Curated annotation (Swiss-Prot):
It comes from the Bacteria. This is Protein Rv2250A.
Amino acid sequence: MTHREELLPPMKWDAWGDPAAAKPLSDGVRSLLKQVVGLADSEQPELDPAQVQLRPSALSGADHDALARIVGTEYFRTADRDRLLHAGGKSTPDLLRRKDTGVQDAPDAVLLPGGPNGGGRRRRHLALLLRPRHCRGPVWWRHQRRWWA
């Protein structure tokens, strides 16, 4: 396993924790979920990550190249598998959304820390304001002192 692979913790895209340590829910927890969240036992098979359709990345080619240069291509991920593992949080509503067979939201890219000193240095150089998807307008790239649409 390379250093970069160690930066990605083992996780399922649609559940909590390390899949190797997964255990079935107790009857008490299953009952609580049925009462509080309204979940019922499902006969629906678990979606394989390869079957999940993701919203395409909205990064332009120029933004993709700029981010890859800033953090280093080995720490910049846009593959569907990497994006899927970071597609939302692990709250109950987030996990319930993962059961939807439609197109899933996912980040446009995943940036990994580049070693013990890489994170701070990269943050200083990156220094950009990320905007939520619903906001429109330019992004300020402070290190270059210019606006990017």
